[in-house]
Structures are given as structure tokens and as C-alpha cells.
Regions:
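Acidic, surface-exposed loops and disordered segments
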Residues: 1-176
Length: 176
């Protein structure tokens, strides 16, 4: 896949359902993380790190610690077979800095744009069970979870619409 920036941005949506059995290789995940080296970094601190979660068993342990689609109250998230193929856990190394300014968002967006270029999609997740997820990932104290980036081959089609009357809430068709 090759896209111009506007095309990448339009294709880069929050995908919440995936073709779960289409795996993403560790090499592809390393390439996505590698893109962040080219991002701006406040004071050039380079304080954001990533935990790559590609193993099926570990993915299964991460999943129940995530909250999906806050505006879709009657939806508990993707079902088995629709779950992400991998996760990149964005971590702030607090031994370097206490605040990453806006670097976390810049890097998360860069990772998703890279994923789109490879034919994948993802969702940046901020709603998670922090302590439980830290335990699952066996993280040392100085690493703070900033975001969970869920990745996979999208199983859904996202339709962009102009916002009407200030209503910014997303929705889902009854058939998913």
C-alpha cells in the first residue's frame, strides 16, 4: 500500500473489530515502533518506550483489561475472532521525564499511519485497568502506561460523515 498523507489520514480510523487470525509479524511491529524514532521529542528526551504484544496467549491476557467504545454502551467490545492481532503498549519511562508533553499522541498517530500503509488498522485506547494490565505485562515501577495501541487487519468499514449539530458521538450500524 502506498498513500499520500491525506489518503493515509482518511483511511486511518479507529478500528475496533479485526480479522483476528491475520497475525502481524514481530518484524512489522518493530518497523512500526521504529517509525517513532523520526518523531519530534520534547527536549529530545526519547522517554517513550514500547512493549510489543504479539503472542496469542499474551494478547488474550491483555484484552480483558481494555475498555472499548465508550459511546456504544450496549457493546462490550470485539468478540472472539474479531479481536486485535497485536498490541503496542506505549510506556513513559519516568526515570527520564515525568511528563512527555504531547509526544505520546504524535507517536501513537505515527504508528497508526504506518499500520495503514501496511494494510492494517488500529485503535488508540486510553481506557484500561492500569494495575491489572501492569501485572499482566510485568512492568517495572518506572514505566507508566500511556496508551494501548490495538492493531490488526480491519474487519469493519468506517464511514466518515460531516458532524451535524455539534453531535460528535460515533455510532455503529445494527449489523456491526
Amino acid at each position: 500500500y502506498r498513500f499520500m498523507l491525506k489518503e493515509l489520514l482518511l483511511k486511518n480510523r479507529s478500528y475496533r473489530r479485526f480479522v483476528q487470525n491475520v497475525r502481524i509479524t514481530r518484524e512489522e511491529l518493530a518497523e512500526l515502533v521504529g517509525l517513532t524514532r523520526y518523531c519530534a521529542s520534547g527536549r529530545n528526551a526519547q522517554a517513550l518506550k514500547y512493549k510489543v504484544v504479539a503472542d496469542v496467549d499474551l494478547c488474550d491476557k491483555v484484552f480483558p483489561n481494555l475498555a472499548w467504545a465508550g459511546y456504544l454502551k450496549d457493546w462490550d467490545g470485539p468478540e472472539e475472532g474479531e479481536r486485535p492481532a497485536a498490541y503496542l503498549i506505549q510506556l513513559l519511562d519516568t526515570s527520564i521525564v515525568e511528563n512527555c508533553l504531547c509526544d505520546d499522541g504524535i507517536q501513537a498517530q505515527t504508528i497508526l499511519l504506518g499500520a495503514v500503509e501496511k494494510g492494517y488498522g488500529g485503535c488508540i485506547i486510553k481506557a484500561f485497568k492500569n494495575e491489572s494490565l501492569r501485572e499482566v505485562l510485568q512492568l517495572p515501577e518506572h514505566l507508566k502506561i500511556m496508551y494501548v495501541i490495538a492493531l490488526g487487519k480491519p474487519k469493519e468499514t468506517v464511514v466518515l460523515e460531516e458532524m451535524k449539530d455539534g453531535d460528535y458521538k460515533y455510532w455503529r450500524e445494527t449489523d456491526g
